[in-house]
């Protein structure tokens, strides 16, 4: 019953949800500026302005917070990407470009988010498997956008889509860290061009007999 008590017009559940939101926001700030290794329970509590004892009501471990922050960014990418696809009329190419635009906007506009999903997750034992799973899932979306007459479930299409996703991630990382300087529209155009070049190659070789 204590969880339903009202304090300041807010229920216990509302206060727990608000504390969780503040912990996630603090995790985003620290993971995106100092790195995952430096994002500790104590540091997150201090950044959130909350007593450390509240942490356990939302997250069993600090790794669970890391995952929650990562998942929140992926959810934003997916939501914005799918909305962009739905709002774009025309060819598969135009819809794919809209999705790539949404991805670039999330990861490059807020550099904290880009650092977490593109850099920090690679070396994290907690986030690494999740990153791979999400890459495979997004590769499936890319395969479906190909517009290819080839079945998107075939091995060749899946490999090409996975290749494209990896290339997109590495390219965005290079832009994020300043290794490549390019304007937004040119970047998205090139990514889209390379995406469809890879998928065209699959169509061109579909049915080719492999000889070893």
Predicted regions span which residues?
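Amphipathic alpha-helical segments used for helix-helix packing
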Residues: 107-126, 143, 173
């Amino acid at each position: 019953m204590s969880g339903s008590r009202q304090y300041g017009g807010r229920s216990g559940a509302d206060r727990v949800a608000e504390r969780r939101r503040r912990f996630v926001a603090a995790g985003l700030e620290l993971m995106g500026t100092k790195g995952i290794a430096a994002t500790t329970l104590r540091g997150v509590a201090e950044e959130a302005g909350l007593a450390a004892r509240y942490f356990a009501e939302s997250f069993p471990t600090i790794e669970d917070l890391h995952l929650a922050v990562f998942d929140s960014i992926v959810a934003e990418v997916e939501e914005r990407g799918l909305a962009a696809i739905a709002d774009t009329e025309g060819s598969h190419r135009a819809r794919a470009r809209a999705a790539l635009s949404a991805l670039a906007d999330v990861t490059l506009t807020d550099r904290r988010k880009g650092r977490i999903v593109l850099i920090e997750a690679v070396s994290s034992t907690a986030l690494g498997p999740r990153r791979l799973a999400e890459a495979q899932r997004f590769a499936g979306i890319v395969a479906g956008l190909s517009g290819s007459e080839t079945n998107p479930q075939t091995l060749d299409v899946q490999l090409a889509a996975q290749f494209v996703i990896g290339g997109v991630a590495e390219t965005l990382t290079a832009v994020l860290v300043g290794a490549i300087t390019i304007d937004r529209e040119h970047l998205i155009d090139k990514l889209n061009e390379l995406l469809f070049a890879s998928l065209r190659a699959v169509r061109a070789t579909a049915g080719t007999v492999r000889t070893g």
